[in-house]
Regions:
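Short basic helix-loop element that most often maps to the first helix and adjoining turn
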Residues: 8-23, 52
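Short alpha-helical DNA-recognition segment
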Residues: 19-34
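DNA major-groove recognition helix of helix-turn-helix/homeodomain DNA-binding modules
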Residues: 48-63
Length: 68
């Protein structure tokens, strides 16, 4: 999964739930800068932060074999 997929999914979920980036940071316990970096598609974000944010929406990150 590349950073653009994560970024797009996070933005979509946040907007569907009517949350601002500040709201998302507060509710997930992740810093605002981390939320912004995730939504900007920064490739070097920490996986624990990604997992923490998606957990708020009921998602978990799991390894999945690539389809060739």
């Amino acid at each position: 999964m590349n950073s653009n997929v994560i970024s797009s999914a996070l933005k979509k979920l946040r907007k569907e739930y009517g949350l601002t980036q500040v709201d998302l940071a507060m509710k997930s316990g992740v810093g605002l800068n981390s939320v912004r970096e995730l939504e900007q598609g920064k490739a070097t974000v920490r996986m624990d932060k990604v997992a923490q944010v998606f957990d708020l929406f009921g998602y978990e990150l799991v390894p999945q074999k690539k389809v060739k």
